[in-house]
C-alpha cells in the first residue's frame, strides 16, 4: 500500500471559500477511490448544540469526508469567538501548540489515504506572539494548495502568497480559482494571468475553476476539480 497523501489548504484571504474548496476536494478524493479525512486544526467561531461545541466549517468538512475523525482529533483547538485566532486564544486562555496539531495529523494519516488540512484565514495569520499559519504548514511539512478568491485584487494576492509559500521552503502543489464575485469584470483574464505566472514561476498547475454557486455545493464543485492531476502533484511533491 502506498504511503498516505496530505495537503495543506490555504487562501489568498479570509472568506474566499477555503472550506468550500476543501470540501470539494474531499468529495473528489472519495470519488477517486480514496479514503479521505479532514483536519481543521484551529477553528475560531463555535456554536453549542446538544451540549457540544461545534464549528460550521468543521461540520462542512465532516459532511464531505468519507473517513470520520473524532472532533478532538479533527479540531484540537476550537475557539468560541469568530475572530483572529491569536486574539481569541489569548482571551480564552488557550495556547495554540503546533506540536499538538502535528501529533493529530500523524494520527489522522494512520486512518486515511489522504488528509486535507485546512488552515485558518490566509497564509500568514498569527497564532501566537511568534508563530503563524505558515509555521504550521512548515511544521506539518506539507505541499500547499492555494485557493484564490477571484475578485478585484486577486492577481497580486495570489502571487504574493505564492512567494510566501516558496520562502518557507514549501511546494505549491496547485491552485484553485474560486469565483466569489459573480459581477467581476475580466474574470477570465485575471485567472489566465495567475495561471500563466504560477505555471512559469512555480510550476504550479491550475487544479480547477469553480463557478460562483448560490448556495455553495461542494459535491457539485468537486466535478470542476482535476483530482487526478492533484493526486499526481501531491505524489510528486512527496519525493
Swiss-Prot record:
<dbReference type="GO" id="GO:0004141">
    <property type="term" value="F:dethiobiotin synthase activity"/>
</dbReference>
<feature type="binding site">
    <location>
        <position position="19"/>
    </location>
    <ligand>
        <name>Mg(2+)</name>
    </ligand>
</feature>
<keyword id="KW-0067">ATP-binding</keyword>
<keyword id="KW-0479">Metal-binding</keyword>
<feature type="binding site">
    <location>
        <position position="118"/>
    </location>
    <ligand>
        <name>Mg(2+)</name>
    </ligand>
</feature>
<feature type="binding site">
    <location>
        <begin position="118"/>
        <end position="121"/>
    </location>
    <ligand>
        <name>ATP</name>
    </ligand>
</feature>
<feature type="binding site">
    <location>
        <position position="57"/>
    </location>
    <ligand>
        <name>ATP</name>
    </ligand>
</feature>
<feature type="binding site">
    <location>
        <position position="57"/>
    </location>
    <ligand>
        <name>Mg(2+)</name>
    </ligand>
</feature>
<keyword id="KW-0547">Nucleotide-binding</keyword>
<comment type="subunit">
    <text>Homodimer.</text>
</comment>
<dbReference type="Pfam" id="PF13500">
    <property type="entry name" value="AAA_26"/>
</dbReference>
<dbReference type="GO" id="GO:0000287">
    <property type="term" value="F:magnesium ion binding"/>
</dbReference>
<feature type="binding site">
    <location>
        <begin position="15"/>
        <end position="20"/>
    </location>
    <ligand>
        <name>ATP</name>
    </ligand>
</feature>
<comment type="pathway">
    <text>Cofactor biosynthesis; biotin biosynthesis; biotin from 7,8-diaminononanoate: step 1/2.</text>
</comment>
<dbReference type="InterPro" id="IPR004472">
    <property type="entry name" value="DTB_synth_BioD"/>
</dbReference>
<comment type="similarity">
    <text>Belongs to the dethiobiotin synthetase family.</text>
</comment>
<keyword id="KW-0093">Biotin biosynthesis</keyword>
<keyword id="KW-0436">Ligase</keyword>
<dbReference type="GO" id="GO:0005524">
    <property type="term" value="F:ATP binding"/>
</dbReference>
<comment type="function">
    <text>Catalyzes a mechanistically unusual reaction, the ATP-dependent insertion of CO2 between the N7 and N8 nitrogen atoms of 7,8-diaminopelargonic acid (DAPA, also called 7,8-diammoniononanoate) to form a ureido ring.</text>
</comment>
<feature type="binding site">
    <location>
        <begin position="178"/>
        <end position="179"/>
    </location>
    <ligand>
        <name>ATP</name>
    </ligand>
</feature>
<feature type="active site">
    <location>
        <position position="40"/>
    </location>
</feature>
<keyword id="KW-0460">Magnesium</keyword>
<protein>
    <recommendedName>
        <fullName>ATP-dependent dethiobiotin synthetase BioD</fullName>
        <ecNumber>6.3.3.3</ecNumber>
    </recommendedName>
</protein>
<keyword id="KW-0963">Cytoplasm</keyword>
<dbReference type="GO" id="GO:0009102">
    <property type="term" value="P:biotin biosynthetic process"/>
</dbReference>
<dbReference type="GO" id="GO:0005829">
    <property type="term" value="C:cytosol"/>
</dbReference>
<dbReference type="InterPro" id="IPR027417">
    <property type="entry name" value="P-loop_NTPase"/>
</dbReference>
Amino acid at each position: 500500500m502506498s504511503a498516505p497523501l496530505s495537503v495543506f489548504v490555504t487562501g489568498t484571504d479570509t472568506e474566499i471559500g477555503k472550506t468550500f474548496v476543501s470540501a470539494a476536494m474531499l468529495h473528489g478524493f472519495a470519488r477517486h477511490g480514496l479514503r479521505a479525512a479532514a483536519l481543521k486544526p484551529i477553528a475560531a467561531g463555535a456554536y453549542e448544540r446538544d451540549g457540544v461545541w461545534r464549528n460550521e466549517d468543521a461540520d462542512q468538512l465532516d459532511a464531505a469526508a468519507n473517513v470520520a475523525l473524532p472532533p478532538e482529533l479533527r479540531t484540537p483547538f476550537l475557539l468560541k469567538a469568530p475572530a483572529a485566532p491569536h486574539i481569541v486564544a489569548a482571551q480564552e486562555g488557550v495556547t495554540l501548540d503546533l506540536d499538538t496539531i502535528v501529533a493529530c495529523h500523524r494520527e489522522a494519516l494512520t486512518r486515511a489515504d489522504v488528509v486535507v488540512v485546512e488552515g485558518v484565514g490566509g497564509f500568514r495569520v498569527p497564532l501566537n506572539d511568534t508563530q503563524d499559519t505558515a509555521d504550521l504548514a512548515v511544521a506539518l511539512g506539507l505541499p500547499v494548495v492555494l485557493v484564490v478568491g477571484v475578485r478585484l485584487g486577486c492577481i497580486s494576492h495570489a502571487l504574493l502568497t505564492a512567494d510566501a509559500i516558496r520562502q518557507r521552503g514549501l511546494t505549491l502543489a496547485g491552485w484553485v480559482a474560486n469565483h466569489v464575485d459573480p459581477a467581476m469584470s475580466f474574470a477570465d483574464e485575471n485567472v489566465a494571468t495567475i495561471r500563466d505566472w504560477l505555471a512559469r514561476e512555480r510550476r504550479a498547475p491550475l487544479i480547477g475553476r469553480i463557478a460562483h454557486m448560490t448556495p455553495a455545493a461542494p459535491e457539485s464543485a468537486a466535478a470542476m476539480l482535476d483530482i487526478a492531476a492533484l493526486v499526481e502533484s501531491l505524489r510528486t511533491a512527496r519525493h
